[in-house]
């Protein structure tokens, strides 16, 4: 799919992978709707991009707020990139007792249910569009994590949510094939995003040293570059791509 002149929704656009993706797509000529609950971050991204971007304050778990964003995308809407998500560190049984059910449910609600909410509403709008080359109507890119496969201590909730995102990729791609809509997922490894920003520098260096090559944290721009490749290559469909420098997390 040609990106130039199309409109894309990017969730979690206020920082990290979402911000880099919004910048990448706008640079390729797209209009970007920057969705986030972080008003300052979302407005900052849209402002940095300029005329090709608009900030939309939207909670991915809200049907009405996402539906309004989809409506704002108009007839040029060509897809979405799901980057919104949260992470927690909580053991199944810790010093204070069992994992809090509320915190587990919150991670699932935002990371998995929120992603699906965006997928279904965007896909419903795209299905009404006139098809382009090869009958394509749009593309949706999701964000999982290598934690979906190599989850660490304290990552039960996060791994479950990202494992769900990885698992829904193929069935949704099959569901939407008749409409000419592709569904892909990227599973990033260790990236230099706000989720890791709070760690002490020695801890960040230790994490980077675990990556076989390149032995560093990923740059969000590298994630965004893969998003662009996925959008532009119609044969990429129904797959989860690990973007991790060959990292396989050891139990810790």
Question: Where are the language model's segments positioned?
Answer:
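C-terminal substrate-recognition "lid" of short-chain dehydrogenase/reductases
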Residues: 219-243, 248
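Short, small/polar-rich loop/turn modules that mediate ligand/substrate recognition or access, typified
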Residues: 177, 182, 236-239
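Catalytic Tyr-X3-Lys loop
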Residues: 86, 97-117, 141, 158, ...
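Alpha-helical segment proximal to the catalytic Tyr-Lys
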Residues: 124, 173-175
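Canonical Rossmann dinucleotide-binding motif of NAD(H)/NADP(H)-dependent dehydrogenases/reductases
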Residues: 2-33
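Residue(s) in the substrate-gating loop at a strand-loop-helix junction
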Residues: 145
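Conserved glycine-rich Rossmann-like NAD(P)H-binding loop of the short-chain dehydrogenase/reductase
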Residues: 28-44
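Conserved mid-core segment of classical short-chain dehydrogenase/reductases
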Residues: 87-105, 124, 128-134, 154-157, ...
